[in-house]
Amino acid sequence: MNYLSNYTVEEKAVLCITRSADINPDDEIYESTDDYRTHMKKVIKMRARLKPVRLEIEGNRHKEIKKYLSERLNISEQDIFKSQAPLDLKYVYKLTDKVSKEERKNGCYRPFVPALNRDFIPGVSVTKQILEEDKLLSFPFDSMDTFIELLKESAKDKETLSIKITIYRLARQARIVKYLCEAAENGKEVLVLMELRARFDEENNINYSEILEEAGCKVMYGMEDYKVHSKVCLITKKNSRGIYYITQIGTGNYNEKTSRLYTDLSLMTANVDIALEAAEVFQALSMGETVEETDHLLVAPHCLQNKVIHMIDREIEHAKAGEPAYIGLKMNSLTDKKIMEKLIKASKAGVKIDMVIRGICCLIPGVKGETDNIQVRSIVGRYLEHSRIYIFGTKGREKVYIASADFMTRNTLRRVEVAVPIYNTDIKMQLIEMFITMLSDNVKAREEDHNGNYKIPKNQDTPLNSQEFFYKQAYLNAKNVNS
C-alpha cells in the first residue's frame, strides 16, 4: 500500500535513530516474585524504549525537517548528523559473494585458520600435557579447540570432580556450553557464573543460563555491585594420589567466534597455588563476596590496583638506586588516575616505560620533565588487539602477568577481574618477546607524541606487521608439529 499516493514527494531521506543502551538493572523496580534472570528479561525489553541519543540522516538536508525531528524525538539539533555513507552496513558481509576470486585475492586478506599450538602433541590427552608443563594459547594464531578439548576430556573423565567457570560473552553456537552440560549430566559438579549484564549479550547469556540449568549445572548471575569480567576456569580432579587441578585464566572471553578475530592469551596450568586462589575466587563469588587478599593472583576490586602500584613503586626504588628499571604494559585502555599518577612518578625517577594501548590513553607521553621516559603505541590491524600483558622489572627479575583487566577505574575498582602470574620461564620469555615484537611494529602501529597525536613510527627500515609476524610464526610451528 502506498500511503503517499495523494502527496507529491519533494525530498526523501533515510533515518537512523540510536537509542541509549545504558540499562542498569539495579535502578529498576525489582519484583519480589521475580528471579534475577526474569528481572533481566524485563529490563532488556526496556532498551527499545530508551531515550534517543543520536539521529543520522542520509539524503534530505532540509532545515525544517531537522527541526521537526528534533522536537518530536526530543533530541538536540547538535545530536543530529548528516551522513554521506549508507546508514546500514550489514550488506557488506554479503559483498564477498559478488567479488571474483581474482579480486578477492588482490583486495582481501588471505584466509587464516588458527593452528594447533606448537606445545601440544596431536592425539595426546590435553589434560596430561598440561599436567606435565604450563601451556599458553595465543589467539587467533592458536586454535581455541585445544581448550574446548580440555573441557570435553574433563566432562567424560571419571577423575573429574568439578568444573567451575566465569562466563562474560559466548558465541551464538557455543561448544563450551555443550561440554559443560555433558559434564553435569555425567554427574560432575558444574558451577557457572554467568554475567547477565554483559552489554548487548544479555539475551544470549540468559538463553544459555537456562540451557545450563536444565542440564543440571548450578548457575549464578554475578554480583549486585560488581560485574564479573574475569576469565577463569577451575577443573578439580581426584585420583589414587589425591586431589589435583587444572586452571585456565585468560584475557578474553570464551567466545569461539571472537577467538578468531581478537588477539587474546590463555594460560593453562596445574600449579596448585594458582588453583587454590582461583578456588577462593569462586568461593567468594558463591557467597556474594569478593576476594580481599591474595599471594599469587591479582584480583580486582580489592587486590589488583594496589598490587600494581606496589610493583611500580618497586621499579621506582630500583631506578633511584641506579639500577635498570622497566615497566611494559599491553592493554585496551588506560584511564585509572592512581595508576597514571604512579607511572608519571616512575618516569620522573628514570623508569623506562613502554605501553601498547589500542584505545583510550589518558596519559600523554614525552612531556618534558614529566613523562620523558614513557612511550605509548597503538596497534590497529586485521585482528582486534584485546590481550593484556603486565611486565614489571628487567634483567632476569621480570614479573609477568596476563589479565582480563585494563587499567580503567571501572576494571580496577568496579569489576571482578583476575590477573595471573607467569611462573613458567619459557612462557614468560615468549610473552616478553611478543611484547618486543609489538614495540617494533612499524606497519600497523602508531606512536603517540607529547601533543596527544598519533603518528607513523620513525623506524621504517624493515617493515614489520606484528600480527602478520605472529600468524606466520604459528603456521610454521604447526607445520613443524605435524611433520
Residue ranges with predicted function:
Residues M1-I327, K345, A349, C361-S483:
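N-terminal localization/anchoring segments of enzymes in phospholipid and broader phosphate metabolism
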Residues K352-V356:
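Hydrophobic alpha/beta core scaffold segments
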